[in-house]
């Protein structure tokens, strides 16, 4: 199964996602700025590539009612987050959903907003309620203009989400036992569904194993 996981080289959610991706044989792409501790072990993104994110970060800051960081390292992490979202088909986030159901708290919220602004689908495991949510767009007429509004809706009774061909997994450094279990279950149900097991079996037969 040709799938790969994109992550940002941090602790907590990032580390566990990388461990699970390796366990299931996924390709892994780690995106870090040049001054990140992980840059010693993987090729960092160049400054020229990172700064391409600056206009998007400014737009996200406006929607999040936040200021763009002025500290170089903090800004470089947001630039990294933009490129994580850009390269992913779908983003799986583990964080705290705000009361307005439109934003996610902390650094994870920046990545989620950057993904939404790029039209990416986002699945959120809300660590407040330990429930899955999905991003959903609605369109309103405001001042004679069509305006898109994205909010998070409860997953409901549908089969829980599974990883896609190109998935980014993002979240907090500090993860609870419930969040840890949710991350592990995400990978497990992706690769243990009957249709996925059958695909792996056929690929192994093709290799005469």
What is each model feature region?
Residues 209:
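Conserved ATP-binding/catalytic motifs of P-loop helicase motor domains
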